[in-house]
Amino acid sequence: MFTLPGYDAFLGFLLISAAVPALALVTNKLISPKSQPGERELTYESGMEPIGGAWIQFNIRYYMFALVFVIFDVETVFLYPWAVAFHKLGLLAFIEALIFISILIVALAYAWRKGALEWS
């Protein structure tokens, strides 16, 4: 059998981290009370009787706006530590940040040209 010396602790941690959630799920399935469908399946409407179904179709534009927002929100998360340590990092970090920003500007221009930012 192929073994890597020094990785025994990692393998043990990996096995335990896979076994604990699996054991929790199996235990929950075994000891949870079995309920019949009915009241549990209804949508909660703040004490009122539910009107209509719970499934609503959303316009795909909402997802496009959310995706663009998440991309630029992550950009802000990456740029903030760089801006805080700007004086200590030097010219190489400045060039790397410019490359990162330019890639995101190209992505924004692409989304703009494809109409992902237009609501029509």
Curated annotation (Swiss-Prot):
- What Gene3D superfamilies has UniProt attached to this entry? NADH:ubiquinone/plastoquinone oxidoreductase, chain 3 (1.20.58.1610)
Per the record, its GO cellular-component terms are: NADH dehydrogenase complex; plasma membrane-derived thylakoid membrane
Segments passing through the bilayer: 6-26, 64-84, 89-109
Please list the coiled coil stretches.
Answer: none
EC assignment: the record states: 7.1.1.-
Q: How does it sit in the membrane?
A: Multi-pass membrane protein
Localisation per UniProt entry? Cellular thylakoid membrane
Q: What is its main location?
A: membrane
| Gene Ontology biological process terms, A to Z | photosynthesis, light reaction
Subunit description: NDH-1 can be composed of about 15 different subunits; different subcomplexes with different compositions have been identified which probably have different functions.
User: What role does it play?
Assistant: NDH-1 shuttles electrons from an unknown electron donor, via FMN and iron-sulfur (Fe-S) centers, to quinones in the respiratory and/or the photosynthetic chain. The immediate electron acceptor for the enzyme in this species is believed to be plastoquinone. Couples the redox reaction to proton translocation, and thus conserves the redox energy in a proton gradient. Cyanobacterial NDH-1 also plays a role in inorganic carbon-concentration.
PANTHER family in UniProt: NADH-UBIQUINONE OXIDOREDUCTASE CHAIN 3 (PTHR11058:SF9)
Q: In its UniProt entry, what is this protein called?
A: NAD(P)H-quinone oxidoreductase subunit 3
Its source organism is Prochlorococcus marinus (strain SARG / CCMP1375 / SS120)
